[in-house]
């Protein structure tokens, strides 16, 4: 077995090309502990849950009045909410993953320990990904329980599909936030770039594609391919098709 293949160390940890999964697990738990003290994450989670409940209340249930809509109707109403809130969550969480610790000096202290940059990146991404998933599960779960109690659960599969697509969107924007954080020296700079990226992905990209298509007379297939570069567009198309 070569040094680049999967092997077991005497300490019991797996190692693949210099990456120790025991170290990664430690870093993941560290990120989860830090997330518990993150007030912004709690604010995102409660805001998302509150807005989801508000949408489910105001959506028409087809019963002749206001009420908590069923899963299918509410899932359709939540698409626009997800397109606004979830990318902002992923981008800002990712933007502060490295830049904030670099500015405070804690990243240099962490890298002075017997860890590699790859282990730090993987551990932080998994930890923040689980944190983001927990926040989304809280919002969707609270809304889903109340909707199922007062509404109809016949189309619960549509709701679960939306939850899965939302998680993928959150992880995609979290990755973009990580790239922003890796290239920023200060947390404020990373947050500013993340906000501009959010505005570009959520609002400007549609106008840019339409303007480019008109000016350059782009074919529909090329325009469709360009739209797939935006994770929000991919989510929107997948959600509509589902």
What are the residue ranges of the model-derived segments?
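Cytosolic juxtamembrane amphipathic/interface segments immediately preceding
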Residues: 25-35, 67-71, 116-119
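A structural motif at transmembrane helix-loop-helix junctions in multipass membrane proteins
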Residues: 167-216
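Aromatic- and glycine-rich beta-strand/loop motifs that create alpha-glucan
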Residues: 2-45
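Hydrophobic/aromatic residues in alpha-helical transmembrane segments
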Residues: 87-94, 142, 175-176, 205, ...
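Helix-loop-helix units of permease transmembrane domains in multi-pass membrane transporters
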Residues: 97-129
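Terminal transmembrane helical anchor/hairpin motif
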Residues: 3, 62, 203-242
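Secretory targeting signals
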Residues: 54-57, 64, 68, 74-75, ...
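Long, hydrophobic alpha-helical segments
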Residues: 77-100
